Amino acid sequence: GSGKSTFLRLIGKLQEGTYQGNIRINGILLEEINMDSLYGKMGIVFQEPYLFGFSLKENIIMGRNVKDSDYEAILKKLNLGYLLERFSDVELDTEMVAKLSGGEKQRIALARAMVGKPQVYLLDEITSSLDEQNAREMEEILLAEDAMVLYVCHKIIPELKGQYEMLTF
């Protein structure tokens, strides 16, 4: 590829590497940003999300103090409300995770990022396993967030294209 995913990993300080030029977040050089403060303000979702052998709720809140109403609202916002009944407090085993569609896994991973109310989202191909309707809804949800969204993708919904500030390679 052209380095889009690597670029996101560099910004999230998940990978070290050499590059030309400077990377700044809100005007601050990436090298000068405190790692602890950076991770507390970022929501990161990769193209291939990982789900742990925990309950659905534990997979999303990841030990954070989150009100049940906020957790449920995020699931409903991402069209995952039906999973509340299906997997409420059941631990997700390998077989259950295998039965989830790629789009469901992706939306669960986005819910995990959203529940932390990040200031910056780093998103790598998060709509690639979604049908067009779900991809559109997810993009609209992200565009409505009060956060910076760095979104690596191969295709953007044409009608939403004008709402992005784009960086292309």
Language-model-detected regions and their locations in the chain:
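Conserved "ABC signature" C-loop
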Residues: 49-95
